[in-house]
Swiss-Prot record:
The modification Phosphothreonine is found at T292, T382. The modification Phosphoserine is found at S2, S9. InterPro entries: Kinase-like_dom_sf, Prot_kinase_dom, STRAD_A/B-like. Residues 275-302 have a biased composition (Polar residues). Transmembrane segments: none annotated. This is STE20-related kinase adapter protein alpha. It comes from Macaca fascicularis.
Amino acid sequence: MSFLTNDASSESIASFSKQEVMSSFLPEGGCYELLTVIGKGFEDLMTVNLARYKPTGEYVTVRRINLGACSNEMVTFLQGELHVSKLFNHPNIVPYRATFIADNELWVVTSFMAYGSAKDLICTHFMDGMNELAIAYILQGVLKALDYIHHMGYVHRSVKASHILISLDGKVYLSGLRSNLSMISHGQRQRVVHDFPKYSVKVLPWLSPEVLQQNLQGYDAKSDIYSVGITACELANGHVPFKDMPATQMLLEKLNGTVPCLLDTSTIPAEELTMSPSRSVANSGLSDSLTTSTPRPSNGDSPSHPYHRTFSPYFHHFVEQCLQPNPDARPSASTLLNHSFFKQIKRRASEALPELLRPVTPITNFESSQSQDHSGIFGLVTNLEELEVDDWEF
């Protein structure tokens, strides 16, 4: 593997970052007080810090990437991310507040998301899945972002719960811009693309069959719609389909037409729903892929099956449409936004989501912490330890 020199990598990235036009924060390292490390990533070359923006006292996240250790391929990858971050401007896409070079590190500054990611929520509070209305609000925000991305001529290629971030005011943001791929070549929009996502091991369960096949037929924006369907199952069931399955078996399952489903009274046999929860298993719609259910209290005396619930026919149909094996049979993001599944939405996400996410408490209210006294930060760090920040791609 060839590596750029420190000067070469910094100069290459700087051509993108020093002309930051989207920045609402100053692109200077001295303006940010790094408080604590909350994650690592990008082949261990990236450190994620909680930081305080000194001019306003606002808490932000700062991704610092060691450019001196990056290969040529990694630098090109990062350049693509920065280009997309400047190109995109949408209320449901995570905005980059500043990007700049400091001491041979690429710094990427974004607002701190007080509710974390949707994956954090299902891992820490909604282990058996979220309620349907909350999912509707979240997926509506994701589809609005995807509709914009697709109209801009890009494929996202990394839609999953950990790339859906929720702010303090209940707004939904799609992140993971690093994996976006342009379908424009020489000024013309291509019908399909063939590039396989780099550094994609963690996203394999969400990828569509046509992306995994890596054949001459290629794939297009409809591959993101498949990922939306998988993400819907992830949010509703509390786990992602195909989890822990070997890549080759996963590919075979998808190519053979195995379609995951929502786990409820319409998809789980009645005899399983009446079993003792410790003995019952719920088939997620995948052959040989069983998920052991866990006891939950019911009326204070006997445990009930965690999936003894019924999602609406509209939600089931929505997921079925997204997971059509034939990409041409999947609706576009704009078409899905008009699906009956979203008719249950009556308010803005910013008004409804904080209520629907109770008893989750957003990580916030540390304004009283002074620059020399970070006692309030210790509580924040404790809460952050529960979040899977490594998976956040801001």
